[in-house]
Amino acid sequence: MAVRASEISRVYEAYPEKKATLYFLVLGFLALIVGSLFGPFQALNYGNVDAYPLLKRLLPFVQSYYQGLTLHGVLNAIVFTQLFAQAIMVYLPARELNMRPNMGLMWLSWWMAFIGLVVAALPLLANEATVLYTFYPPLKGHWAFYLGASVFVLSTWVSIYIVLDLWRRWKAANPGKVTPLVTYMAVVFWLMWFLASLGLVLEAVLFLLPWSFGLVEGVDPLVARTLFWWTGHPIVYFWLLPAYAIIYTILPKQAGGKLVSDPMARLAFLLFLLLSTPVGFHHQFADPGIDPTWKMIHSVLTLFVAVPSLMTAFTVAASLEFAGRLRGGRGLFGWIRALPWDNPAFVAPVLGLLGFIPGGAGGIVNASFTLDYVVHNTAWVPGHFHLQVASLVTLTAMGSLYWLLPNLTGKPISDAQRRLGLAVVWLWFLGMMIMAVGLHWAGLLNVPRRAYIAQVPDAYPHAAVPMVFNVLAGIVLLVALLLFIYGLFSVLLSRERKPELAEAPLPFAEVISGPEDRRLVLAMDRIGFWFAVAAILVVLAYGPTLVQLFGHLNPVPGWRLW
């Protein structure tokens, strides 16, 4: 064992980013686990079952449904997704380029995220920041929540610099060459997030922090909401694109095939850079004070964002068909049966993609200026984003552990652990699909979101059937979560090591249609130009409205309703 440990230490000396990536992953999945433990209580609430009295006995610090909902949303939708992105979208390009990232900055970003998380968590646990994950003013939390959250989010700016520095060094050593695919995805992803995160940074610096410190009397809720949704919608793609990077560059290899088109993958990511951010007003269709013309423009741009996802569906499906036919699949659908359905690293993202199809269709409804009024602020909305982040993103992250943990730690995954992983991803998928049906159905029956409806059990008798779906989903997902916890820690705490696993290259897929000698690829590789175009689009989409809103500020004092 000592020999094995020394060999692993040697691997970490050669590739120190492995240990930092592992720290990001473990912290992220711990956040997912803790946040998800509150999930069944939310599901039971939407099944008209009030389980919060039981939760208060188990966890006395939980004072209300809304505190549990805040913890669930913050830990799952913000903390887990960000830490997973900081792990994947730094480690993958570093390994593709075979270059060492700036380790001082990588550890700085981890410590910023960790300290920010701890500082923000303390008021959350003390019921001093029960403001939900959207933290809309005039709901006012403790200053430590806003300060910790700001430090946590700003840690991503360090990650941005790390990847841009990797790319710059590679370009300097390889003049005239096209950026490799994974690195291209990472650079575009982080530039997209920089533009997107500016809204949240402005909200925190200009309003939330001075307000919570008592330096100003109040905040204009409409301005704060507008700045939040500047970030709040593109954060969906901050969740999504690390999963897409895995689906494009790792999944075809797991399936036994190749990626059919490198240029299509690049174009999809480039479109996300251009179109992800100037779309936030579709979350504010019901808000006064914003010109309907701008709402319509954002609605149209939101519909355009569906295009790169449709391109992804085509490219990935073609890649999987190629893999299935290489594995002996015949006939119209025989290739599907031939795919490796015994491999959780393959099954998890594929099931996530299947769930993403109705999730994307629901997103078209949300983006519509007229249809959104039917489902706005109903249970339909959490039904939609559970198909996005809780299905595709989370399942892809879970599946990635089966090739990533051995590469980071040298710890093998046994056949029994893989079988357990299959059970987890199928149960998780089943639970999310049942929940999606229940929440979408309840939303169409005007059951509201963000509501403690179990306290008024007679209010929605017409929604009794979809409520049964939500209860069933909560039970299935709890079983899946407990099995996942057992499986994850059985690997992390294992003493068996095989250093050759940690020394092996990542399973990047080969491509059929590559980037060589293509004018489109050369044009897309002018990333600085496209970033400037994206920035101009953001200024055009938000500038006129923000100028108007900042010229007519209406600050109101903070409220505490919990």
Swiss-Prot record:
Residues spanning the membrane: 21-41, 74-94, 105-125, 144-164, 187-207, 227-247, 267-287, 300-320, 345-365, 385-405, 420-440, 471-491, 527-547
Binding-site residues, Fe(II)-heme a: 72, 386
Organism superkingdom: Bacteria
Molecular-function annotations in GO: cytochrome-c oxidase activity; heme binding; metal ion binding
Cofactor(s) the protein requires to work: heme; Cu cation
Positions annotated to bind heme a3: 384
Keywords on record: Cell membrane, Copper, Electron transport, Heme, Hydrogen ion transport, Ion transport, Iron, Membrane, Metal-binding, Respiratory chain, Translocase, Transmembrane, Transmembrane helix, Transport
Localization annotation: Cell membrane
EC number(s) from the headed UniProt entry: 7.1.1.9
Membrane topology listed for this record: Multi-pass membrane protein
Catalytic activity: 4 Fe(II)-[cytochrome c] + O2 + 8 H(+)(in) = 4 Fe(III)-[cytochrome c] + 2 H2O + 4 H(+)(out)
Bound cofactor: record note: Binds 2 heme groups.
Any single Pfam family the record assigns to this protein: COX1
Crosslink position(s): 1'-histidyl-3'-tyrosine (His-Tyr): 233-237
Binding positions for Cu cation per the UniProt entry: 233, 237, 282-283
PANTHER family membership: CYTOCHROME C OXIDASE SUBUNIT 1, CYTOCHROME C OXIDASE SUBUNIT I
The name this protein goes by in its record: Cytochrome c oxidase subunit 1
Species annotation: Thermus thermophilus (strain ATCC 27634 / DSM 579 / HB8)
Gene it is expressed from: cbaA
